[in-house]
Amino acid sequence: MPSPKAVERIAIVTHNHEPRVADAVARVERLAEAKGVEVTGEDGRPDLAVTLGGDGSMLRAFHRFLGTDVPVIGVNFGRVGFLTSMVANELETGLERAFVGDVTVVRFPTLDVRIGGQNRPAVNDVFATSSRLGRMVELGYSVGGEDLGVLPCDGVICATPLGSTAYNLSNGGPVLVWGLDAMVITFVAPHSLHVRPLVVPHMRDLCVTNKTPDGSVTVIVDGQEAGRLEPGEPVEVGLGAQTGMLATLPERTFFTRYRKAFAS
C-alpha cells in the first residue's frame, strides 16, 4: 500500500446540490483554512480528493483521478456509503486525521473494456444484457482465449474487487477482498445448473460475443451505456493498467465495512 503523507492541497468533489452538502463544503473549506491546507480545483494537483456524497459520487471521483496517484476519501451523504470513510457528523474529526496522513491508502485495480474499437476504464463493473427489456440473450464467452461455450441468460457481470459488493453480490457472485488483483465474472439468471462465478487473475481476459440471432446486447460500464453488440460482435474485458486509490481511516477496514453492511 502507498505510504500516506501530510496533505497540503485538497480538491472537494461533490455532485449533490442539497443544502446539507453545500453546508458540508463550507465546513471542509473552513477546516482546511484552519489547518493551512489549500483548497484547489480538480485540475490543481491535489494531494487528496475529498468526496461529499454516496458511492456514486465516489465512483465519479475515482474516474476523475485514475492514474494520478491522488487518493479519494469520502464523507457519506448517500444511502449505502460502502466506499466512504465517515458520516457527516464525523467530517471535522475524520478530515483532521486525513490532513496529517492518519489514513490507510488502498490501491485497487480497474477494468479495461474494449468495444467497437475503443477502450474504456471501469472502476466498478461491466454488465452486458439484452437491449430489449426483459429478453433473454445468448452469450458466447471465453477466458484467456479458451472457449467456455454459449449460455442463454439475462446477462453477465464482470466486476473489480471494489465493485464486487454491488450488482455482482446481488446476483450471487463472491465478494473480492480489497487488495486482490483479480476480477469476478458472474452470470445473471443463467439457464444452466452448472455455471458458477469465476475469479480471474491478470492476463486472463474475458471475451463475450453476442450469439443472440435476432437481438442486440447493450454493454453498460459503471452504470453508463458504452455501446451495443449486434449478433456476432464481441466485447473484451480485462484488468487494466490504470489503478485507483482509496483513502480510509485505519479502523474502517474492509471487514469492518463488510460486517456492518452485509453480516449484521
Residue spans for each PLM region:
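ATP/NTP phosphate-donor binding region
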Residues: M1-L48, L52, R60, R64, ...
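A residue-level signal for conserved active-site and pocket-lining positions in enzyme catalytic cores
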Residues: H15, V50, N76, V126, ...
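Short glycine-rich anion-binding loops that position phosphate/pyrophosphate groups of nucleotides
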Residues: H17, G54-S57, V80, L162-S164
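Short glycine/serine/threonine-rich phosphate/pyrophosphate-binding segments
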Residues: G56-F62, T165-S170
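Proline-centered loop/turn at the N-terminus of a beta-strand
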Residues: D69-P71
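Catalytic core of DAGKc-family lipid kinases
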Residues: V80-G155
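ATP/nucleoside-binding phosphotransfer catalytic cores, i.e., glycine-rich phosphate-binding loops
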Residues: R120, A128, L133, G144-D147, ...
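Gly/Ser/Thr-rich active-site loops/lids in small-molecule metabolic enzymes
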Residues: V150-H194
